[in-house]
């Protein structure tokens, strides 16, 4: 995983990438966590564990998508997360490039995809930990269906998302399209992605990915 900032030419390169290449890059990112040595792990049970689906949870209807605007901050009240958001591209290996480890409390937004609040599935990534401490998405797997994620945008609006699914997916049987594709056409959706499972010292990577799916249900100022 590269700690370098993506170059100014990355945006032009990313616009030419196919959706399949993006999915592969996201999968590669999860496999390349080699600098984290602590065994700070998120829960995982099975190949694709649904950890955020309380029974009989009634979710609100989807709101109309907003126009395009850049994300500036993400708030997850139930986790106590208030983090700046920075645009990211792909690294030299073609994997999505998260913020560097010295900015482990920052969330990266994939700038080649949808913008949070606009139609499509916007992708955000963050570290689960560093060598020495938990990072911004350390508690991500504890989110539950019905809880709220807010993205503050540069147009002054707050895109309010409701969590509808939390998955811990084994890397051995990873369904990239299910994880990152839009679940319902026409909706504004959000994916929050980090490492999960346990840290395998031999391979230098985590055994799973935590993927939170949410959709736009309101706006604020």
For each feature predicted by the language model, list its residue ranges.
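Terminal targeting segments of Actinobacterial cell-envelope proteins
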Residues: 1-13
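Hydrophobic H-region at the start of alpha-helical membrane spans
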Residues: 11-22
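Solvent-exposed, non-transmembrane regions of membrane-associated and secreted proteins
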Residues: 23-144, 150-221
